[in-house]
Amino acid sequence: MAKLLAVFLVLLIAALVCEQALACTPGSRKYDGCNWCTCSSGGAWICTLKYCPPSSGGGLTFA
């Protein structure tokens, strides 16, 4: 039982660290060449869903 709890805690901590690494600064905006993205008050990207024709270049990368 103790090992199961330890594994659960490790997974929980890993998930929280990953979530924080992907968070953005609330109010910040980015343009990917077609759509605008705004960072919500909760730290998540919200983007317009305008159709974007295929292009040779990449787009905005959230990493």
From Swiss-Prot:
Domain of life (superkingdom): Eukaryota
Gene Ontology CC terms, in alphabetical order: extracellular region
Known tissue expression: Expressed in hemolymph, ovaries, testes and fat body of adults but are absent in the gut. Also present in larval hemolymph and fat body.
KW Transmembrane helix (keyword) present: no
Disulfide feature: C24-C39, C34-C52, C37-C47
Keyword set includes Disulfide bond: yes
Site residues (Reactive bond), renumbered to this chain: L49, K50
SUPFAM superfamilies hit by this protein: PMP inhibitors
Function: In vitro, active against alpha-chymotrypsin.
Family note: Belongs to the protease inhibitor I19 family.
Protein known as: Serine protease inhibitor 3
Upper classification of the organism: Eukaryota, Metazoa, Ecdysozoa, Arthropoda, Hexapoda
